């Protein structure tokens, strides 16, 4: 009786597993928010894997932060350089904008497209020059950046050869090679791995000569190896640890061998390591039979498989980073999210770096100061300094959003201190500080004993303004805004002024300082700027700032306004600052008028018009924009005042504080009022003469 033919054993491959480092998702989130927006074009990425280095744990293909394109201007990146532990593998990422789009992806078509790329590389010979293309992979994903959760699915396209590859023999490499051969093969492998030129080349040839000397060569050198060996093996870095199965990369490797060289019997070498050195006890050597079905050509594209299983099921994986992230870092990402989303569609030209780096000084931490601070935070501004001398009163928390009942207990917390604490509680990443300080005011004379303290406050205020980029004038009285207005004009700092009446409000931005404007103009397009500066808060006054606090009734001492005014005015003040920061001319930007400007086509002002003044009334639910030029007689920002301050310094400030008429005399307002009074008297005389003539007639 004839013996029964032993059935062929089909070669089984251990699937390749994926691993995604958290850094990859963080980097991808930044790329999505900052650059991609709604663009869902495929992204070239790089995965990394290496030979198995543990007898019980397989190696994974890993995505790291460096897996994404390094060139921010291009989403098609060349394969990153690897090292002995990170062999680079090209891949493609398909990220969808909605979970519905993710679920509707044609996964079979995507897999086939990537498999076709591998086959084209095999046919063109590229796979011989760069074998890393053989384990090419793809990833589909959906990133919910609001919740910091990610859904993803890997595929490792692998060809299904028909008929299947038959396994003839498989054994540990230490049993296949003689002791002399094993020693030489180990040394050759270690040299290959130690060389910077070959350490990350995962496919190679192992040639053993008749005198037991081993050498390792590139795949493209196969013809040079013909007849020069006793044993020739096709080696590859095997990520699998199993003793009876080779790893997934061998599948496409065998397809390459069959297609390029028409070999029917192949010896393969599954290279594995232990502690960074070749381990022939873990490594495998096998013999496989590769045959073509009748009528099939070696150039026919085989079918492909490769979607990774998740716990044995064909479903995607998901990960949430919210729980693992530092709460402050998570808050920073969440706060930045809405701003970055603005750039996707609504405002692509928005410069977020300018906003995040600006330093704001808030003079006044009352009703307006609280509203301004909250709105600044919404725009991503992190550096805020409060200056205030008052304490939190029982009446404050309901109108001033940064304070609560506990801040009022005892004698009350200083507002500048309580405001800082509140901002930190709202958003821990805020860089904020509070300064408890009174602002010296003209019309409020001081004694000689107080001079040192007042001048110290003046110096400190000047230093604060110099160290900040924008200053908000939000104090309760008009005269308390004079010194900050002067110092801002002197330092050429952005000054935003907001003031409230009972049912009306005024928000304005000050123009550039008088002595700095001429210097800045040399670097600006003259056609885009006004030849005259924009005015400040005091430019329309014909009197110097005076004491507005003495001899006042209770309703005049307190800020009595309709509660809705402060949120409106505070928001407008911040929007005005953001407009200035986004404008190419900054503080020198001209004042726009809402009735004359075209808000739909303004390249210089991406946020819309940039007015000089905004005045509104809630009693009439109306709002208008006004334009006012700087006055040569202004008591705060005129060149006369700034020059006098620079020349006299402290003595000038003391004289302005102690002598109410000094500023009027200095700027010529005294003479102007005298001329106006004389003009009125002349008219009265003329009217009297005319009456006399009429009577005579």
UniProtKB/Swiss-Prot annotation:
The effect of disrupting this gene, in the record's words, is: Increased number of peroxisomes and accumulation of peroxisomal proteins.
Its Gene Ontology biological processes? autophagy; defense response to fungus; leaf senescence; protein lipidation; protein transport
Query: Annotated Gene Ontology MF terms?
Result: Atg8 activating enzyme activity
Q: Which UniProt keywords apply?
A: Autophagy, Protein transport, Stress response, Transport, Ubl conjugation pathway
Q: Does the keyword Transport apply?
A: yes
Pfam families, per this entry? ATG7_N (PF16420), ThiF (PF00899)
Q: Which InterPro entries match?
A: Atg7, Atg7_N, Atg7_N_1, Atg7_N_2, ThiF/MoeB/HesA, ThiF_NAD_FAD-bd, Ubiquitin-activating_enz
Annotated GO CC locations: cytoplasm
Q: In which tissues is it expressed?
A: Constitutively expressed (at protein level).
Region annotated Homodimerization sits at 656-697
Which superkingdom, per the lineage? Answer: Eukaryota
| SUPFAM superfamilies assigned to the protein according to its UniProt record, in alphabetical order | Activating enzymes of the ubiquitin-like proteins
Say yes or no: keyword Protein transport present: yes
Q: What does this protein's UniProt record list under function?
A: E1-like activating enzyme involved in the 2 ubiquitin-like systems required for cytoplasm to vacuole transport (Cvt) and autophagy. Activates ATG12 for its conjugation with ATG5 and ATG8 for its conjugation with phosphatidylethanolamine. Both systems are needed for the ATG8 association to Cvt vesicles and autophagosomes. Involved in the senescence process. Involved in the degradation of damaged peroxisomes. Involved in the non-selective degradation of chlorophylls and photosynthetic proteins during stress-induced leaf yellowing.
Q: Which family would the database say this protein is a member of?
A: Belongs to the ATG7 family.
Give the domain section of the comments.
Answer: The C-terminal residues are required for homodimerization, as well as the interactions with ATG3, ATG8 and ATG12.
From the Swiss-Prot or TrEMBL record, give the protein name: Ubiquitin-like modifier-activating enzyme atg7
State the species of origin: Arabidopsis thaliana (Mouse-ear cress)
What's the gene? ATG7
């Amino acid at each position: 009786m004839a013996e029964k033919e032993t059935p062929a054993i089909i070669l089984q491959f251990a699937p390749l597993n994926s691993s995604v480092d958290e850094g990859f998702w963080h980097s991808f989130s930044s790329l999505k928010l900052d650059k991609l927006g709604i663009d869902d074009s495929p992204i070239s990425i790089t995965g990394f894997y290496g030979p198995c280095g543990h007898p019980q744990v397989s190696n994974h293909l890993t995505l790291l932060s460096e897996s994404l394109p390094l060139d921010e201007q291009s989403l098609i990146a060349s394969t990153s350089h690897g090292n002995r532990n990170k062999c680079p593998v090209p891949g493609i990422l398909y990220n969808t904008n909605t979970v519905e789009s993710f679920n509707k992806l044609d996964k079979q078509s995507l897999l086939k497209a990537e498999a076709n790329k591998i086959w084209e590389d095999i046919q063109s010979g590229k796979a011989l020059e760069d074998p890393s293309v053989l384990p090419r992979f793809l990833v589909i994903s959906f990133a919910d950046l609001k919740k910091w959760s990610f859904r993803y699915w890997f595929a490792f396209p692998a060809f299904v050869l028909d008929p299947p590859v038959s396994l003839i023999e498989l054994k540990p490499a230490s049993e296949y090679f003689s002791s002399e051969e094993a020693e030489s093969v180990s040394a050759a492998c270690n040299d290959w791995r130690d060389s910077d030129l070959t350490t990350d080349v995962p496919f190679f040839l192992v040639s053993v000569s008749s005198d037991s000397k081993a050498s390792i060569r590139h795949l493209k050198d196969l013809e040079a190896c013909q007849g020069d060996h006793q044993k020739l093996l096709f080696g590859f870095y095997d990520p699998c640890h199993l003793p009876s199965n080779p790893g997934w990369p061998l599948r496409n490797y065998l397809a390459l061998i069959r297609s390029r060289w028409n070999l029917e019997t192949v010896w393969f070498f599954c290279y594995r390591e232990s502690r960074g050195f070749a381990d022939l006890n873990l490594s495998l050597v096998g013999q496989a039979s590769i045959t073509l079905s009748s009528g099939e050509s070696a150039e026919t594209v085989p079918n492909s498989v490769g979607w990774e299983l998740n716990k044995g099921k064909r479903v995607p994986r998901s990960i949430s980073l919210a729980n693992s992230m530092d709460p402050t870092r998570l808050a920073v990402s969440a706060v930045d999210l809405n701003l970055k989303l603005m750039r996707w569609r609504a405002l692509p030209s928005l410069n977020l770096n300018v906003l995040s780096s600006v330093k704001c000084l808030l003079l006044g931490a009352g009703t307006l100061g609280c509203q301004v601070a909250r709105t600044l935070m919404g725009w991503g501004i992190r550096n805020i300094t409060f200056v205030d001398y008052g304490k939190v009163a029982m009446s404050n928390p309901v109108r001033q959003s940064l304070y609560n009942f506990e801040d009022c207990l005892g004698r009350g917390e200083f507002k500048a201190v309580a405001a800082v604490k509140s901002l930190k509680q709202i958003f821990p990443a805020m860089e904020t500080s509070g300064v408890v300080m009174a602002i010296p005011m003209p019309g409020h004379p001081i004694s000689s004993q107080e001079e040192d303290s007042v001048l110290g406050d003046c110096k400190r205020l000047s230093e604060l303004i110099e160290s900040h980029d924008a200053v908000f004038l939000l104090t309760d009285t008009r005269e308390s805004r004079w010194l900050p207005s002067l110092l801002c004009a002197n330092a050429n700092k952005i000054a935003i002024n907001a003031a409230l009446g009972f049912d009306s409000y005024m928000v304005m931005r000050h123009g550039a300082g008088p002595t700095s404007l001429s210097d800045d103009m040399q670097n600006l397009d003259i056609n885009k700027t006004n030849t005259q500066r924009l005015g400040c808060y005091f430019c329309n006054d014909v009197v110097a700032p005076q004491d507005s606090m003495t001899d006042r009734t209770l309703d005049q001492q307190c800020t009595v306004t309709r509660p809705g005014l402060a949120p409106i005015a505070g928001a407008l003040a911040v929007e005005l600052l953001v407009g200035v920061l986004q404008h190419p001319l900054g503080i020198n930007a001209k004042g726009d008028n809402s009735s004359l400007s075209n808000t739909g086509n303004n390249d210089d002002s991406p946020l819309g018009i940039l007015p000089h003044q905004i005045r509104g009334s809630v009693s009439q639910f109306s709002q208008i924009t006004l334009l006012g030029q700087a006055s040569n007689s202004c008591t705060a920002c005129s060149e006369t005042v700034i020059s006098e301050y620079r020349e006299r310094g402290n003595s000038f400030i003391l004289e302005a504080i102690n002598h109410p008429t000094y500023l009027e005399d200095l700027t010529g307002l005294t003479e102007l009022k005298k001329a106006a009074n004389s003009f009125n008297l002349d008219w009265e005389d003329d009217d009297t003469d005319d009456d006399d003539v009429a009577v005579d007639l």
